[in-house]
Amino acid sequence: MSIGKIKESDLCKSLAVFMEEVYKDCELYYEVKTIRDRKIDCVCKTKDGETIAIEMKLHANLTVLYQAFNNLECCNYSMILIPAGCLRDFSRSFIKTLCLKLGIGLLLIDRYNKVTLETCMTKNENPSNAGYVKLFEQQKNFVGGEASSACWSEYSQTIYEITNWLKEHESGNLTDILKQINHHYSSVSNGKQAIMRYIKRGILKQFEIVDLDGIIKLKKEE
């Protein structure tokens, strides 16, 4: 593995292998949105329900450590994964010491794609902002570490569920649809108004309005 050519997205596969070996039957979610529109490269949910935030970077610096430390506000544990080759001898001990003091797990990946845990993690029993971390099935298919990757939000999930509902029913009134799905709006009426407004503005291009009372359907693919 060439350090000069490796990308953050290349770290995903090796991370997945390591996490499955250590945490059997865990689930990995990528590009997870959290508080203040920050996002975590990867969140691992163990079969016991604990969460581990992992930042995958090509270099170790104070910014990465700051991100990882902040992730403890949202998850039970926090790690960083970096290539072993990016650390010089003098900085390796420095980074390890900082990780130990901050309670952050340091994962190093070598040229053979093997991942090792260099420092132990400190558990945060009750992350103050855990409620801001929303994990959706779709995030399992994202590519962690890609700057262009969009976060899957509660809004994304709502639109996804509306789309699936319309695929089964062809058309329907938004009031009825929102009553039958999980959505993030404070009320059905607020959700209906917002979605109708987005359709009219062309933001939700996959839907079209059948009736101004709130009946919508999926646009046919051209």
Give residue spans per PLM region.
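Non-catalytic C-terminal interaction segments of nucleic acid-processing enzymes
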Residues: 98-217, 221-222
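Acidic-basic catalytic patches of nuclease active cores, encompassing PD-(D/E)XK
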Residues: 1-39, 43-48, 93, 101-104, ...
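N-terminal cationic-hydrophobic initiation segments that often serve targeting/anchoring roles
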Residues: 20, 69-72, 166
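Short, well-structured alpha-helical interface segments that form or flank functional binding sites
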Residues: 10, 37, 62-66, 73, ...
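Conserved catalytic cores of phosphodiester-cleaving nucleases, focusing on short active-site segments
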Residues: 15, 42-44, 48-60, 78-80
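Catalytic cores of nucleic-acid endonucleases
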Residues: 58-110
